[in-house]
Amino acid sequence: MAGRKNSTFAVTKVRLGNGLQVDTRADTVAGEEPLEIRTGGQTITTTMRTPGHDIELAHGFLHSEGHIASLSDVTEARYCAGATVNGMNTYNLLDIDLAKKNVLDLSDLRLTTTNSACGVCGTSSIEALTKQTRYQIPHIPVDPYVVAKLPDKLRAEQKQFKKTGGIHAAGAFTLDGEPVVIREDIGRHNAADKVIGHLLLEDRLPADDLILVMSSRASFELVQKAAMAGFGMLVAVSAASSLAVETARETGMALVGFARGDRFNLYSGELA
């Protein structure tokens, strides 16, 4: 699995600095493969992800979508053998056995292919989210000195980004800024689901004493996932969308964007 997180290709690099310079050499590219998640023999979703921590990804996705509430809701998660005509296991098909067979209404399930850019976007409203959220979002004052250090701490743990330059990261940090878990994926939504899935598997939800840090922009979808997991603060290195800001304010979540160096934007919440 580790070898599939990235691939090596012959790449022609072109520079125009001091005249045209062309150099062909081996370069590392972030891995991207489909992961189909099934339950009861039916497909829940297919997401384009970077292989690795797929069990966490599946648990995090199901929790973020409101399909499971705790680890006990899943009895088994396993890769499907015989995924090709030759009987090979591609590790791209994951079967999830649920404790309650009727926890998902498969007849009404939104079957989607989730790309690595935006995931399942725009399918929920703020009102629906506030009704669906299981946890009370904690009020966490934003400590500017802690927040300012979080992006660099996240970047320091991005091993695949250092190799490829093309992969997102999500991390759960303590309120003092110490890392609890960091995951990487070509899709920011997958990286967040992997973190949430890890916390679920470790019985660490709700994450009301943790901060979710993203190496991306802050979209509605990421605020949604953070709220479903009980985070009281989301920190992103890039901009926040209008719906993300509105959702954070409605749920009471602190939302930080453009966290770079010694500055950031506070879209929702208050300073400590």
Say what each PLM segment does.
Residues M1-A170, T174-L175, P179-I182:
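Intrinsically disordered, low-complexity regions enriched in acidic/Ser/Thr/Pro/Gln residues
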Residues P34, H53, I196, V223, ...:
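Short glycine-/small-residue-rich flexible loop motifs, especially phosphate/cofactor-binding loops
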Residues G52-D54, L62-H63, I186-G187, I196-L200, ...:
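Short, solvent-exposed amphipathic alpha-helical segments in soluble enzyme
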Residues L109, A239, L243-A272:
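C-terminal binding/interaction regions
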Residues S125, V146, L150, G166, ...:
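General structural feature for long, well-ordered alpha-helical segments within catalytic domains
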Residues Q160-S216:
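Glycine- and Gly-Pro-enriched alpha-helical subdomains that act as flexible
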Residues D203-A240, A248:
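Extracellular/luminal Protease-associated
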